[in-house]
């Protein structure tokens, strides 16, 4: 149950804030831990996109920039649905993470399902 609209729930304080960020401001840290964008996956996400069930991309705000930890295919699917133009994206934004913590969270939540870049 939401008490107010500052992202606080009864007894729960999530480690992120929901924020709308323009996709042109989102960085995919491929040289560090992200995998490349797979066009077929983006097209599948765009084809089946449902805003009621989509997971918000997870983003780390570090050094004044927004780094995508998870959800790059969702972001690219939204852009594809927007005719290829950048657009606002609802994101879960985490603060206070190091690059290493971002990489660890990415790897743990994705279960090492595919090879990570040489940055790890």
Where are each of the predicted segments found?
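Amphipathic, charge-rich alpha-helical segments that serve as recognition/docking helices
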Residues: 90-120
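Short alpha-helix boundary/capping and kink motifs at helix termini
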Residues: 1-69, 73-98
């Amino acid at each position: 149950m939401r008490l107010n609209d500052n992202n606080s729930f009864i007894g729960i304080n999530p480690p992120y804030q929901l924020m709308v960020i323009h996709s042109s401001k989102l960085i995919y840290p491929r040289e560090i831990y992200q995998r490349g964008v797979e066009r077929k996956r983006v097209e599948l996400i765009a084809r089946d996109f449902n805003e009621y069930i989509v997971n918000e991309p997870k983003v780390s705000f570090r050094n004044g920039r927004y780094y995508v930890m998870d959800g790059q295919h969702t972001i690219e699917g939204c852009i594809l649905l927007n005719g290829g133009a950048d657009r606002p994206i609802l994101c879960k934004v985490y603060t206070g993470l190091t690059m290493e913590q971002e990489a660890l969270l990415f790897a743990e939540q994705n279960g090492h399902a595919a090879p990570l870049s040489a940055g790890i």
